[in-house]
Amino acid sequence: MTQIKINGVSYDVKEGATILDTINQHDIPHPQICHVPAVDPIETCDTCIVEVNGQLVRSCSTKAVDGMDVYLTSDKAKAAQTEAMDRLLENHLLYCTVCDNNNGNCALHNTAELMEIEHQKYPYKPKVEPHEVDMSHPFYRYDPNQCIACGQCVEVCQNLQVNETLSLDWEAERPRVIWDTGVAINDSSCVSCGQCVTVCPCNALMEKSMLGEAGFMTGLKQDMLDPMIHLIKEVEPGYSGIFAVSEVEAAMRSKRTKKTKTVCTFCGVGCSFEVWTKGRKILKVQPSDGPVNAISTCVKGKFGWDFINSDERITKPLIRKNEEFVESSWDEALDLIASKLGGIQQQYGPGSVGFISSSKITNEENYLIQKMARQLFETNDVDNCSRYCQSPATDGLLRTVGMGGDAGTIQDIAKAGLVIIVGANPAEGHPVLATRVKRAHKLHGQKLIVADIRKHEMAERSDIFMRPKQGTDQVWLMAVTKYMIDQGWHDEAFIRENVLHFSDFTQVLEKYTLDYAQEMTGISKETLIQVAEMIRDADGTCVLWGMGVTQNTGGSYTSAAISNLLLATGNYRRPGAGAYPLRGHNNVQGACDMGTLPNLLPGYQKVTDDEARAKFEKAYGVPIQSQPGRNNMQMLDAIMEGKMKAMYLVGEDMALVDCNANHVDEVLSQLDFFVVQDCFLSRTAQYADVILPAAPSLEKEGTFTNTERRVQRLYQALPTLGESKADWEILQEVARRLGADWHYNHPSDIFDEMASLSPLFSQANYDVLEGWGSFCWGSHDGKDTPLLYEDGFNFPDKKARFALNDWVQPVEFEAQYDCLINNGRMLEHFHEGNLTNKSKGIQSKVPEIFVEVSPELAKERGIADGALLRLVSPYGALKLNALVTDRVQGNELFLPMNSVSKDSAINFLTGPAADVNTSTPAYKQTKVRVEVLKAKGKSPLPRTNPRYKKRHPQNGVEVQRKWNRPGYVHLTTTNERE
């Protein structure tokens, strides 16, 4: 064991640790203003300097070597640290008591106090005039006059988030942070992730929502505030007593500022963070210790919470009376629901009432929905929105490796030698996950292959970008697999020991030659060989895929083809490898885990399994149907056939997200009784007979499960708004009125019941999940399992199976429908935008919907930016403004999903075609004809949107440029980089 001495005391050192790592490991107080553990040493502040064997070195970048004698507070070290701090304070006013950042976590303030700074050696000099403080961005501001040029914001922007917008202008007379080439923040390539604001150690970068709100005296008008600042700044840096005053004020703030750990309610990455609130005001989101994201966020998680306090929230139960919604009491609404649903069940029997669950609500609430369906209505007719997106991926994995979840964690993706992204755009759909790929690719030599019909950010960054014809991914995947087997590049030992049906599989592959693949996909043979070589040479391959794969007629077969390729090359059962279907919603994984599926009970136990069913029958006190129920699509058919009379839908906008939305409108209108539980009057809710006001995630407790299979707790940050209630409380009230003996006092009671019935979760509970704790399901003994299949695949014989599927060709359209219309997420919005469209800041970046048109098609049809187009499919028509961009090519169009309008929402164009195995709609197989109604107009995307801007990559903060400044005097005696 390596040991070093610190101030004469011996300490153990972890392998590869720096001196500062060791100092922090043992909780020794030491200055370190520019230190960010998530990135490499920045080396800009010099406050961490220590003395080692008579030499002054930066502890953040100096490796701890056995036998080192380190002094933190020797005269030499202390003098260097103090000089470093004085250089920083020359750029900053310490007026802490009236500062918005005086919240106990200001690194500059805390370090000045730790170092017992009494006087400022160099007088403060402002860099710019007050009016030059950059207030242009909707979410945060930058004050150069408070910036100490530590570079943390630059380092995380360049090398952690890898958005590559920020840099430090070291050549300026007074160095400062700049955006792109020095433009206003709102005119830059900034994607509003907020990472720079999160790491800023002072008040140079601040959330606008904090300004004037955080402190007791920070909300004063400027003419009153300025004199106070001048008074404070005259005395505070030189008097430790005044620091004490500011700490008293900070302590007072903490009494009224509530800090609550939560889990993000948007995508499936599962970021967790603290949300700071004052009353109902959301002051800021502060990530720190999340097991998934650490200090990272995206624009939605950091700034997209305006919907919580939206005036559009439903706050009282609504009952349809005379074709109008009328506010009612909870008793009236619940009694009506119990009477109507109970009556329909009694009259028509099982199968007359269907249940649609939600990927937005908690695990506990999803569990109760399936329990209500099976216990009280004797039906397996329960489903969730995974049917619209991820069911094919789950199907492909269940048939090949036995479990329908990610093979490992996001850390495994970052470790992989090669990442292949197929039909997914994680930079916009799963932004924080994408940062880990971008960082590994930029800094650690990871290779990246992207297969997509649209050129998005990850495609631009890739080593190989392939644009296959729509719906042909299975062909190139099988061709690459065949080629690798033919070349002897497959992992024979792995296959022999772990996989069945290899001989049959090679026969299925026979026709998938490189020539055939080139003809069917449009990808050259040379490119496919390069892909095969890259897989061969990689130290671990991870494949990530999304709706560009799953939302096709052959989505489940293509998902299986991905798994087949990984099995053939031995890329399972080890870190840094495996299959990673990217779950779209915050809890779509959890909704499936909890059994809101027609064929599966909680914990993926089959309804056809007599033993599993008997267990639930004993717990629920009723027989469980032994045949799978209807899925979402089949329920709609049953409504049209008059077999299903009522539906209970929670937190889902079926009228927008289902395919062929015009048909869905007609179907929902046929229901005898329809209950919708939601926060907003969604399009689907407009068909309801009763609408129950539900609470969003910040107003309740429970758990979410992310794309890694990771379960995390969320805590209640705000009281419920008006008379709204948590979904689990509403469900319990309904169940009791229907005669159920439900007595849950807290979501933990529900979780414990679920875990007692589900072996995958048997060792999970709220104590395990307390605080920042988490649990990854994946083992039948219920233990935490970050990496799947270490003990074999999830079949009785522990062996995987090659799936034996041929390619399913895409749907054909009449010749008049000559343009393929693709669809997907935008970074700023989440899915249909029901939540994010409540944010003024987000709307300022993306104020309206549009359709992307290629330059080639624009030239051919005479289309310019802003042109008004009518898109007509066999199932409907939309009117949209055009955005001409090379992100699409030829006769391909792209329509963002974030619309709730019948004039612009994609599903008023999509048709009934579906995946062969799972009924998932083939949204991606939609063609239209384009009619030009107006040849040009105003661009639908503001010029302030970062998509117009160019990124400015560099290797972090580039501290050498600081050291090369004329007159710069080094404080260290040795430094390998100087």
Whereabouts are the PLM-identified features?
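Short beta-alpha connecting loops at secondary-structure transitions
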Residues: 5, 66-72, 179-182, 460-468, ...
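N-terminal cofactor/phosphate-binding cores enriched in small/glycine residues
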Residues: 11-66
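Fe-S ferredoxin-like electron-transfer domains
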Residues: 46-262
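Short acidic-glycine loop/turn motifs at beta-strand connectors
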Residues: 53, 65, 276-281, 873-874
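Catalytic alpha/large subunits of respiratory electron-transfer oxidoreductases
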Residues: 93, 198, 229, 236, ...
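Glycine/threonine-rich phosphate-binding loop and adjacent beta-strand/alpha-helix elements that clamp
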Residues: 410, 699-720, 730-737
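Long, low-complexity segments enriched in small/aliphatic residues
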Residues: 582, 589-598, 749-841, 969-971
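Long, contiguous, secondary-structure-rich segments that constitute the structural scaffold
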Residues: 721-723, 727-772, 832, 836-852, ...
